[in-house]
Amino acid sequence: MAAGAVAWLLLWAAWLVGRLAADFSDAPFSAGKGVRATCSEIILRQEFLKDGFHRDLLIKVKFGESIEDLQTCRLLIKHYIPPGLFVDPYELASLRERNLTEAVMLSESFNIEAPNYLSNESAVLIYARQDAQCIDCFQAFLPVHYRYHRPHKKDGDTLIVVNNPDLLMYCDQEFPILKCWAQSEVAAPCALKSEEICQWKSMQYKSILKNLTVQVPVGLTIHTSLVCSVTLLITILCSTLILLAVFKYGHFSL
């Protein structure tokens, strides 16, 4: 009886040791699979350069791992410009001719002279270029300008919020890492001067800032009477000086 109990204990101990050894040998493999399944992040950062009413919107995109295998890929940024700002399509055309940017406006009816309260959101496509100083980075810039805003009663500034853009990528071949980032497909021109339409992958990314904000100085309503009076006086003065110069130095023939 005692011998049988000892035998059963030995068998149970042997089974337990084997089970622990199997679990230990499988642990590194499982951990390795977990590491391989973790996707690196795409980091996007945008900021305003320059001061005053004419700024440059700089957009930088950094991939979480080397993109040496993604040299055949193109990056497209679809940005939505709020009504408080505008992009000059003629300025973009001039920059494209000098090969300084690859951006084109999607909005057809666009008035750069319209004030903020009569304007709508506009969309711009920007074909990003690889950053020469960072092998894993792309960058693009877009010149933007402030619109005229209604005067305020108290505060002399207004806040403009620039939302994060859509990030699109198109590759000539499939890469496993793209499955980590891609969310959906969007139809867009394959290149700036191409009429061919490609299916770009909408990429998931992490932004440094939730939203980019900028303060724009505006007039105050309490200054309306003063501004109108001074403007009228200057207009009358200049008109009078012009008429005096015409009568004094002009040559009239009947």
Curated annotation (Swiss-Prot):
GO terms for biological process: GPI anchor biosynthetic process. It is found in: Endoplasmic reticulum membrane. Residues 248-254 are cytoplasmic. Residues 23-226 are lumenal. InterPro entries: PIG-X/PBN1, PIGX. Pathway: Glycolipid biosynthesis; glycosylphosphatidylinositol-anchor biosynthesis. It holds the Pfam family PIG-X. It is a single-pass type I membrane protein. Residues 1-22 form the signal peptide. Keywords: Endoplasmic reticulum, Glycoprotein, GPI-anchor biosynthesis, Membrane, Signal, Transmembrane, Transmembrane helix. SMART domains: PIG-X. Stabilizing subunit of the glycosylphosphatidylinositol-mannosyltransferase I complex which catalyzes the transfer of the first mannose, via an alpha-1,4 bond from a dolichol-phosphate-mannose (Dol-P-Man) to the glucosaminyl acyl phosphatidylinositol (GlcN-(acyl)PI) intermediate to generate alpha-D-Man-(1->4)-alpha-D-GlcN-(1->6)-(1-radyl,2-acyl-sn-glycero-3-phospho)-2-acyl-inositol and participates in the sixth step of the glycosylphosphatidylinositol-anchor biosynthesis. Probably acts by stabilizing the mannosyltransferase PIGM. This is GPI alpha-1,4-mannosyltransferase I, stabilizing subunit.
